[in-house]
């Protein structure tokens, strides 16, 4: 934890400097590689970790080495991870998907914005200094057309996005030749389908079945295609966003870039303070990953924070505003029904979801059904016109382990399953949000209930936190639950930072939350038996046993922390080649002793073999050549 707290001015200045000096940066001893597909422009980025050779013998003067293969890994950093690409936040990222969108011929540019709020913001000269300068002309589906990846998948069309994803999900494992690295324990997949090789047709089939989604708004062409589904790698979401009391546009863009560097597969902008519209534009134009929002937050701002004053018209305008900016998925709390609210009365912690509490208050004050539920088909029509995926929010999720798996939670979940079928009628992609706070023994039921009642739509959970006693460490309490539910089939995990329940996370908190959740997601992939998931573990173990310290650092999820911890006690360069670490020292290093035992055993085997041959030679009379019948 930092010893000195920066002032607000210092934080903004630091963020501005980060943006102004931003350039493509590779991780230590890594390089950016691209694997091309058959569709024009399909060029899938990955990070390749270069490894040093293994000493296998020879003399001090003439050592003999064996090369170690480079390890390809999934990379969410987009252009920010390529030192060859010039970064200019003022201009935004290259529009990777624009040619693919245009080639389909089913969209049209809008001459005027559909949202009244957007029109008002654009007409306000006072916002010129805050506004992103390179605004896109938004597109929407032509009349009578649907432009969703689900629609294409159901038509049997393999889009460039699907091919991109197939290559990306395979993680370049076909490049690995070593049997040691390719070895993998069988997993327990709990019914997940995990093919040895992911093809574009498999991606299409999973999307068509509703088991996976590709969040890819036609107005966010900068994003690199990714997929969320239990038959693919477990994904991680990072939340960012300003509030009424802290953070700025510069800081949120900095957090976006930082999040993608540390492995965020998607980012949710949960801004609730001033300049929500302008902040979101900067984020979208500079984001290589899908961006999600909770539109009710901004709709509430438009009615001065008074939940009772919310209207369908204000909410609809917000959906159009955000869809035309390029938001890839909306969290919609349409399952918080009026009749479910009394079910929460006996809870220890009531309704803890911000969106859920807003809708519950609206329902009670008007004594009417949730307007999101009532207008759900209209919501789907909007989403189908821009390919905005729906993340059906768990507004009644438990906020404490005491409230886990209660009547209200599962009543809402069943309603989300009904809404999923409605969304699919409109070819709208859907995932389901889940808890929350759930003790370990109760976690699996959440997954089985979701699969049964939500028709195998992807599950997306916040943790869950497995205990409530550790404020300041809730990235850890939730990481346990995240690893478990990821193993059981959860498709995406929403990270929790050390600041959960305590305050708005800063840059370092974002990193800590992401590293924790990348560990959880990877552990789940290993447990499921996702093909190739163990390659990096095997490479790390081999480097560890061979005392290749630099490779150990570079294979780590966080190379900088691994190196820093090592250097606290062995800072000299000689420590990077030592056959021990400071924990056991040179005489008691288990791996060094193990190597000596293995070498000794190998030598003993040779000696015993030679002795046996010698005895056999003497028993046959000591003749060099034997007659054929004696041989």
Curated annotation (Swiss-Prot):
Binding-site positions, substrate: 239, 268, 297, 333, 353-355, 394-397, 433, 460
Keywords: 4Fe-4S, Iron, Iron-sulfur, Lyase, Metal-binding, S-adenosyl-L-methionine, Thiamine biosynthesis, Zinc
InterPro entries found in the cross-reference section: ThiC, ThiC-associated_dom, ThiC/Bza_core_dom, ThiC/BzaA/B
E.C. number: 4.1.99.17
Residues bound to Zn(2+): 437, 501
Top-level lineage group: Bacteria
Cited function: Catalyzes the synthesis of the hydroxymethylpyrimidine phosphate (HMP-P) moiety of thiamine from aminoimidazole ribotide (AIR) in a radical S-adenosyl-L-methionine (SAM)-dependent reaction.
Assembly, per entry: Homodimer.
Protein's UniProt name: Phosphomethylpyrimidine synthase
Source organism (scientific name): Escherichia coli O7:K1 (strain IAI39 / ExPEC)
């Amino acid at each position: 934890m930092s010893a000195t707290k920066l002032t607000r001015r210092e934080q903004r200045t630091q963020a501005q400097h980060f943006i102004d000096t931003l350039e493509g940066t590779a991780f230590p001893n890594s390089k950016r590689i691209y694997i091309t597909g058959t569709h024009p422009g399909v060029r899938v980025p990955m990070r390749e970790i270069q490894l040093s050779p293994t000493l296998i013998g020879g003399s001090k003067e003439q050592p003999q080495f064996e090369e170690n293969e480079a390890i390809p890994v999934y990379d969410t950093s987009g252009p920010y991870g390529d030192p060859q690409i010039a970064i200019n936040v003022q201009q935004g990222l290259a529009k990777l998907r624009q040619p693919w969108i245009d080639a389909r011929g089913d969209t049209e540019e809008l001459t005027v914005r559909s949202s009244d709020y957007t029109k008002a913001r654009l007409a306000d000269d006072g916002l010129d200094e805050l506004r992103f300068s390179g605004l896109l002309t938004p597109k929407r589906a032509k009349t009578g057309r649907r432009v969703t990846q689900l629609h294409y998948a159901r038509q049997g069309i393999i889009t460039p996005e699907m091919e991109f994803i197939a290559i990306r999900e395979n993680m370049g494992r076909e490049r690995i030749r070593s049997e040691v690295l390719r070895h993998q324990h069988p997993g327990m997949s709990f019914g997940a389908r995990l093919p040895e090789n992911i093809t574009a047709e498999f991606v299409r089939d999973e999307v068509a079945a509703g088991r996976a989604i590709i969040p890819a708004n036609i107005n966010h062409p900068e994003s690199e295609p990714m997929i969320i589904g239990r038959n693919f790698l477990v994904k991680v979401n990072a939340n960012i966003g300003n509030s009424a009391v802290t953070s700025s546009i510069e800081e949120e863009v900095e957090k976006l870039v930082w999040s993608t560097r540390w492995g965020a597969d998607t980012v949710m902008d949960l801004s609730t303070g001033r300049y929500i519209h302008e902040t979101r534009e900067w984020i979208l134009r500079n984001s290589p990953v899908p961006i999600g929002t909770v539109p009710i937050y901004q709709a509430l701002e438009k009615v001065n924070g008074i939940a009772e004053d919310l209207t369908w018209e204000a909410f609809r305008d917000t959906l159009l505003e955000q869809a035309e900016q390029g938001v890839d998925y909306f969290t919609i709390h349409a399952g918080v029904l009026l009749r479910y609210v009394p079910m929460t009365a006996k809870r220890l912690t009531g309704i803890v979801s911000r969106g859920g509490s807003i809708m519950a208050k609206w329902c009670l004050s008007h004594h009417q059904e949730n307007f999101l539920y009532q207008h759900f088909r209209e919501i789907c029509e909007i989403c189908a016109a821009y390919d905005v995926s729906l993340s059906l929010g768990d507004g009644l999720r438990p906020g404490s382990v005491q409230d886990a798996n209660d009547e209200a939670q599962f009543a809402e979940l069943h309603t989300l399953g009904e809404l999923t079928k409605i969304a699919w009628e409109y070819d709208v992609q859907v995932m389901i949000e889940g808890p929350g706070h759930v003790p370990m023994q109760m976690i699996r039921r959440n997954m089985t209930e979701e699969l049964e009642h939500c028709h195998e739509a992807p599950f997306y959970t916040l943790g869950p936190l497995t205990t409530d006693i550790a404020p300041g460490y809730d990235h850890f309490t939730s990481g346990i639950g995240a690893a478990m539910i990821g193993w059981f089939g959860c498709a995406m995990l929403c990270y929790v930072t050390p600041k959960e329940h305590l305050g708005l996370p800063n840059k370092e908190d974002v990193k800590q939350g992401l590293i924790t959740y990348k560990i959880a997601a990877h552990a789940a992939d290993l447990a499921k038996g996702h093909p190739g998931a163990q390659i990096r573990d095997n490479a790390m173990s081999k480097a560890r046993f061979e005392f290749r310290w630099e490779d150990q650092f570079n294979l780590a999820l966080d190379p900088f922390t691994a190196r820093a911890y090592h250097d606290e006690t062995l800072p000299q360069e000689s420590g990077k080649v030592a056959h021990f670490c400071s924990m056991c020292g040179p005489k008691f290093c288990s791996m060094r002793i193990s190597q000596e035992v293995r070498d000794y055993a190998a030598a003993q085997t040779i000696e015993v073999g030679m002795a046996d041959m010698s005895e056999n030679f003497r028993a046959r009379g000591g003749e060099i050549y034997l007659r054929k019948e004696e041989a």
